Amino acid sequence: MIHPSAKIHPTALIEEGAVIGEDVFIGPFCIVEGTVEIKARTVLKSHVVVRGDTVIGEDNEIYQFTSIGEVNQDLKYKGEATKTIIGNSNKIREHVTIHRGTIQGCGVTAIGNNNLLMINVHVAHDCQIKNNCILANNATLAGHVELDDFVIVGGMSAIHQFVIVGAHVMLGGGSMVSQDVPPYVMAQGNHARPFGVNLEGLKRRGFDKPTMHAIRNIYKMIYRSGKTLEEVLPEIEQIAETDSAISFFVEFFKRSTRGIIR
């Protein structure tokens, strides 16, 4: 079903069964196959391919030669029914690839709202990207990676499968990330190591000085106290009871399975 207000270039191919919403623009030589739904005001510039059981939300800009919902590269995948879901107001630049999920994972590759994926970014099967993230040119996420809100991934960086990157993390360019990265941390290198708190990012997002001071103290407890994470976690949990910003640490450590970068 194609909404009457949608604008579709004559060279675009739209398979029967696709749902194209109000004021959607689909440019030259785009291909939309399968049970795809594209919601209101989303723009496919040109040469964009969208396949499979894919939902793209409202007000997205998707640039040329991007591929969304394609069969993933997991050798165990045998064509099972899995999904790709993209939220609202994302910018997805040229040559980005976003693959559908697997039944061995959560079955869904999901991207939230207000994210920027720059040129040549790869998002593998079952990745979960939340909101307001920036992935710079040639950043690569392996399968099952999770990015929490406001993560910045520098250009040419690679993140190992199943890694969790906490909220407000900044990863420097060319990083190889093979373990989980706690919230608010700056990290860089091969393999990535922590080198402080992302204070500039927190200032830009309106964090006050007492909150940033509390976050720095938690960072010091984790990385400079000489104690193990198991030893400092009870104290962090106690602080988190009265400080919502610190609760991000507690929630993160409950999810973390790969150990944290050191």
Curated annotation (Swiss-Prot):
It is found in: Cytoplasm. Pfam families: Acetyltransf_11, Hexapep. Its EC number is 2.3.1.129. InterPro entries: Acetyltransf_C (IPR029098), Acetyltransf_C_sf (IPR037157), Hexapep (IPR001451), Hexapep_transf_CS (IPR018357), Lipid_A_LpxA (IPR010137), Trimer_LpxA-like_sf (IPR011004). It catalyses: a (3R)-hydroxyacyl-[ACP] + UDP-N-acetyl-alpha-D-glucosamine = a UDP-3-O-[(3R)-3-hydroxyacyl]-N-acetyl-alpha-D-glucosamine + holo-[ACP]. Disulfide bonds: none annotated. Pathway: Glycolipid biosynthesis; lipid IV(A) biosynthesis; lipid IV(A) from (3R)-3-hydroxytetradecanoyl-[acyl-carrier-protein] and UDP-N-acetyl-alpha-D-glucosamine: step 1/6. GO terms for biological process: lipid A biosynthetic process. It comes from the Bacteria. Keywords: Acyltransferase, Cytoplasm, Lipid A biosynthesis, Lipid biosynthesis, Lipid metabolism, Repeat, Transferase. GO terms for cellular component: cytoplasm; membrane. GO terms for molecular function: acyl-[acyl-carrier-protein]-UDP-N-acetylglucosamine O-acyltransferase activity. Homotrimer. Belongs to the transferase hexapeptide repeat family. LpxA subfamily. This is Acyl-[acyl-carrier-protein]--UDP-N-acetylglucosamine O-acyltransferase. It comes from Haemophilus influenzae (strain PittEE).
